Amino acid sequence: MEPERKGLSLASSSDGDGREENKLKQGISQDLASSSRLDRYKIARQLTEKAIKEKKIFSIYGHYPVVRAALRRKGWVEKKFHFLPKVIPDVEDEGARVNDDTCAKVKENQEMALEKTDNIHDVMSRLVKNEMPYLLWTIKRDIIDYHSLTYDQMLNHYAKTASFTTKIGLCVNMRSLPWYVPANPDSFFPRCYSLCTESEQQEFLEDFRRTMASSILKWVVSHQSCSRSSRSKPRDQREEAGSSDLSSRQDAENAEAKLRGLPGQLVDIACKVCQAYLGQLEHEDIDTSADAVEDLTEAEWEDLTQQYYSLVHGDAFISNSRNYFSQCQALLNRITSVNPQTDIDGLRNIWIIKPAAKSRGRDIVCMDRVEEILELAAADHPLSRDNKWVVQKYIETPLLICDTKFDIRQWFLVTDWNPLTIWFYKESYLRFSTQRFSLDKLDSAIHLCNNAVQKYLKNDVGRSPLLPAHNMWTSTRFQEYLQRQGRGAVWGSVIYPSMKKAIAHAMKVAQDHVEPRKNSFELYGADFVLGRDFRPWLIEINSSPTMHPSTPVTAQLCAQVQEDTIKVAVDRSCDIGNFELLWRQPVVEPPPFSGSDLCVAGVSVRRARRQVLPVCNLKASASLLDAQPLKARGPSAMPDPAQGPPSPALQRDLGLKEEKGLPLALLAPLRGAAESGGAAQPTRTKAAGKVELPACPCRHVDSQAPNTGVPVAQPAKSWDPNQLNAHPLEPVLRGLKTAEGALRPPPGGKGEGTVCSRLPHHGHHVAACQTTGTTWDGGPGVCFLRQLLASELPMGPGLPRDPRAPPCLVCRGLLPPAGPCKRCRSFCAAVLQGASFVRLGGRSCSPRTP
């Protein structure tokens, strides 16, 4: 028993030593890990501070690993919004428990996730989480609020680029090309129409019918050319053919005998349509009336269309077509000289129908029957049909490589729109179809070369083995192919410069529609299809072209073009990679600002204002200054209560007409006790040593405001004309420079104004001033404070008298030769007449009292 216990004790001691050693090793490793983390954190902090100082902070939305790696190599720090991986949420259902093992596993997964993300770039990203990114690289522009960006922030997109990045926008913009550059869009862009409006549908229908007529002429020429070429073979070659050619000829003759023969009238109608088309191009239809034009009816067009379908699909033939060969050949030569798209039209009249604003080959179909195309456009709901379908002429004679259709993806970069700056990429790649080319089938697998469509299809068994299995070539590989075919110079002389010219033309037209934001750039991808003559035809322009490395070709070129884009748009150094400057618009210098020449410097002259005391005191409202001349005279005047009712002469004076040209008008109906049937009794109140009467209500001529009181000074019953003093007029005129209708406060007045006006009448200027003083209350009638004229007021002895003297201002009675009005004696004013100033009421300019 003892040895066993001893062995157990030794074993336990050895196990304890091993545990201590393991703990020691774990502690050392943890210290090393903590020290390495600390050093890594210091380095990350230093690099982050440098990046913040140099404004090298970027954010990426989308799958752009090449851009991220390239920017990090250049010292940029990425600001991530969600950089931690998702972990299992700690959620417990009601009544359920999570055991310790599950909690331990969740904690371990969280620690492993933190360790995986604990690299230097993630540390730097956490340090700049509160900083503003100065470069935003997104897959779509709508993700970023375009107008909230600062001037220092760069974005890889422009706003309002739908004018050339959508099919409908490019279709409409290309029609305006002749207004910007001397070029014909039909020479590089297949004609295109929108099926959303009736006018566009009618234009498409006319184009389809013209193309149908020219296709009939092509059929006649091609059919006779084939028969002549077969007959022009040497005799020995025909003999070598033997019975095989004889049997094939007999089969063709038997097949032709079974076909439906079409009359030669079909060719005559086609020639007539083509001649009318040429006449329109040469403007021969201007001098021809609309009635003289013999156009086909809809029934005739329908019959011609059905015969054309039978002809091009091999169900019919024209028996005596050889008789029309020379005529058709001459017309085709004329059409080719004016229509550069005659070669790509072919015989089948195939059109490609595309959605107006979709990409990657979605919902694209090819059709060769006009009724089916119009039915497709009419099938949609009218409210959702706006700008949905675009129909474009399909290139029926493309350049083929090993009987397979292909297109070219070409990149270009725009770094500024004002002035327009375009960079063209030297490298491009070709995309092949998986099927052999044929016009007998209108399947999208044959006629669409988009990788988004072809990647789901298998290559045709009968396709040439020279073509790559991944269906892509680089432009360098294509140039080698052309060199082997003996056409090596075509790339540099025709294809490459024509693509550059097409891109430049498209951007010049779209320049006015794009929002030209500084510190922005965008990479675009243009698709071209080559014709048999190696001329490139622009199909569409794509924004945000795919950079996915789907094939070895795209893995190489897409990474290369992204790095070169950063060199041109971000670094702006001398190294621009494979980009070359395609077009830089000349900078238009703004005109020099000449606003300083219009400035006037100096100090205005200040003139001393003389304070002129008012002559008479009449309380009035400021609104009376804007009154217009009266159109109707009041029924009664203001009588003196102490003298009784007005005399008959006063009643006669009320009928006098009002003179014109007086700028002041005061009309106020007097509502007194006499209006209600009683006699008007003046109410006298003593306040501050003055006698005040109830105010006379006055009303503005054109306003509907309630009546306001107008205090009028009450003159004394006796007036001594000898007390009038005459003064020279010149010193007074220098002081009376108040604008007509101006309001200035009287000296010593509080809150009440003085109304001053100069009233022109018969060469005189009268200044009337109204201040606070006494108020009065008149009897029934209207108080007319209409006109203030020199001839209406009492004059001093020896002063001349105007023979055309108007009546009194108050009672409208005629004034005496000198002195105040004898009827009412209720007005006192300053009179300016001739060269003298007559002051009434004594030196204090106040009304006299008895």
From Swiss-Prot:
Q: Which PROSITE patterns match?
A: TTL
Q: Please report the stretch or stretches of sequence annotated as the TTL domain.
A: 222-580
Q: Which SUPFAM superfamilies match?
A: Glutathione synthetase ATP-binding domain-like (SSF56059)
- Look up the record and report any one GO term of the cellular component aspect: axoneme
Q: Which Pfam families match?
A: TTL
Mind telling me which InterPro entries this protein's record contains? TTL/TTLL_fam (IPR004344), TTLL_monoglycylase (IPR051437)
List every stretch annotated Disordered.
1-29, 228-254, 627-652
What positions does the entry give for Mg(2+) 1 binding?
A: D527, E540
Q: Which reaction does it catalyse?
A: L-glutamyl-[protein] + glycine + ATP = glycyl-L-glutamyl-[protein] + ADP + phosphate + H(+)
**EC identifiers of the protein:** 6.3.2.-
Which residues are recorded as binding a protein?
A: R360
- Listed as disulfide-bonded, the cysteine pairs are none
Q: Which residues bind ATP?
A: K354, R360, G361, Q392, K393, Y394, I395, K405, F406, D407, C449, N450, E540
Q: Where is this site: Essential for specifying initiation versus elongation step of the glycylase activity?
A: R360
Q: What is known of its domains?
A: Two conserved structural elements specific among monoglycylases, IS1 and IS2, are involved in glycyl chains initiation. Two conserved structural interfaces likely constitute the binding platforms for tubulin tail and microtubule.
What does this protein do, in the record's words?
A: Monoglycylase which modifies both tubulin and non-tubulin proteins, adding a single glycine to the gamma-carboxyl groups of specific glutamate residues to generate monoglycine side chains within the C-terminal tail of target proteins. Not involved in elongation step of the polyglycylation reaction. Preferentially monoglycylates alpha-tubulin over beta-tubulin. Together with TTLL3, mediates microtubule glycylation of primary and motile cilia, which is essential for their stability and maintenance.
Protein name per UniProt: Protein monoglycylase TTLL8
Q: Which organism is it from?
A: Homo sapiens (Human)
